[in-house]
Structures are given as C-alpha cells and as structure tokens.
Amino acid sequence: MEIIPAIDLLDSVCVRLHQGDYEKVTRFSEDPVDQALSWQKQGATRLHLVDLDGAKSGEPVNDSCVRAITSALNIPVQLGGGVRTLERAEELLAYGLEQVILGTVAIEQPQLVKQLAQRNPGRIIVGIDAKNGKVATRGWISQSEVNATDLASDFNAAGIAAIISTDIATDGTLEGPNLESLRAMANASSVPVIASGGVGCMADLLSLLALEPYGVSGVIVGRALYDGKVDLKEAIRAIGDGRLQDPPTSKPLMA
C-alpha cells in the first residue's frame, strides 16, 4: 500500500485544517519546498498537494509554490483544489504535475471529468469528500445530497486513475480512518481507492491493510506525520512495498 504524505497550501504556507474548517488552521512549515524535499528524502514515492485557497475560491493562488515544489522533486506530484476547467487541468499537467484531482467538477460537470480522463490517461483522479455519506464541494463549504458511493460508481467506466476518498468528519482529527465508508467506497468503485482522513498512529495504517483486497491501494497522511504520531520511514516499512505484513485474505470486516 502506498503511503502518500500531504502538503496543504494556504497563502503558500504548509498548514492543516481541522475537519476542513478554514477557521481552525495549524501552520506547520513556512517553506513548503523544503518540507516536500524532506518527505522525498524519507522515502515518499508520491506527494499529495492541496491548494486550499484554490479549493475555496477557484483561483490559482498558490501556483508559484506548486511549480517550485514540482520542479524540486524527483517523485510524482498530484494536486487538488480549485481545478474546475479543462484548460486549468491541462495547464497543471503541462508544467510537470503527474496527476490532477477533480472534486467539485466531478459532481457539477461529470462529463468534463470523463473528457479529461480520455484525453489524459492515468492522470486524472476524482476526489470525493464526504460527510455522513454525502458529497461536499467547493472546499467543503457546500454540502450536496449526492451519495458518495453513487458518485464513485458513476466514474467506473470513465478511465480515471483512482478515487481519493476523504471522510471530512475524521480529517485532521487523528482519531482513525472511517473503515466502513472506505469499504463501501471500494465496493462501489472499479478503480483503486486512496484513503484520506483520520490516520493518527501506526495501528490506523495497519488497519487499512484489511481493505487492500477490496481495492484500497494507498493512504494520504498529513497531520499524523507533522505531529510526529507516525514516522514516514517506519510506516513505509510496515505497509509499503517490501513490508512484512500481508493483507488479510479473509474478509473479517463488515459485509
């Protein structure tokens, strides 16, 4: 299972939000490029970037910072937050991002996402951010009545690379991932699912291995790394390539 460290950008500073609340911001690094290089040095095989300003406003506020990070790293970088047009997505891909993550447009303009996936095979990810099973959009400010699993199944034949499933209620809390919602998302999707939200310790990462047989292929970790609750090198040894643990072959979790 791939462990993907996260850098959330707000005014070009590395921060974390609590449950997506822009009023509950913790600043972790004034130098996101240095932070990105640190994660790469510790063994990260991919970096997850979120433009929080873009997610909220739809404007590319942190582009210079994103470009600097992408240029500095030798590992693939994926970006989400405010990517809402075909032109914007392909602009980002053209200057070095490996993948772009589409959230709001996945629910508002699903055909645009499908078009992008066809034009850019393997480079389009759908981000599904949900609270109580319902999809949230526009930086989690707007709540829809669309079921997260229904949205996932809508993209099964679209050619997207993966779905990032974020549980807003656990994001930034360190209280553990929502295994039930992840299992439901993996069952609804025919593409790999990447877990996001709630990881607070090594035991949480190990618990995700039980979902690997269902299609959960990776996990995004943010606050737990910054708070020192999880050591990236140890986490990679525990559940990454070459790990000692194997995912369960039985299906002990909820049916």
From Swiss-Prot:
Top EC class, one word: isomerase
CC terms in the record's Gene Ontology section: cytoplasm
Keyword field: Amino-acid biosynthesis, Cytoplasm, Histidine biosynthesis, Isomerase
EC numbers, comma separated: 5.3.1.16
Cellular compartments annotated: Cytoplasm
Pathway info: Amino-acid biosynthesis; L-histidine biosynthesis; L-histidine from 5-phospho-alpha-D-ribose 1-diphosphate: step 4/9
Catalytic function, reaction form: 1-(5-phospho-beta-D-ribosyl)-5-[(5-phospho-beta-D-ribosylamino)methylideneamino]imidazole-4-carboxamide = 5-[(5-phospho-1-deoxy-D-ribulos-1-ylimino)methylamino]-1-(5-phospho-beta-D-ribosyl)imidazole-4-carboxamide
Annotated GO biological process: L-histidine biosynthetic process; L-tryptophan biosynthetic process
GO molecular function: 1-(5-phosphoribosyl)-5-[(5-phosphoribosylamino)methylideneamino]imidazole-4-carboxamide isomerase activity
Active-site residue numbers: D8, D129
Amino-acid biosynthesis as UniProt keyword: yes
Coiled coil regions, renumbered to chain: none
Family: Belongs to the HisA/HisF family.
Official protein name in the record: 1-(5-phosphoribosyl)-5-[(5-phosphoribosylamino)methylideneamino] imidazole-4-carboxamide isomerase
Organism: Prochlorococcus marinus (strain MIT 9313)
Lineage of source species: Bacteria, Bacillati, Cyanobacteriota, Cyanophyceae, Synechococcales
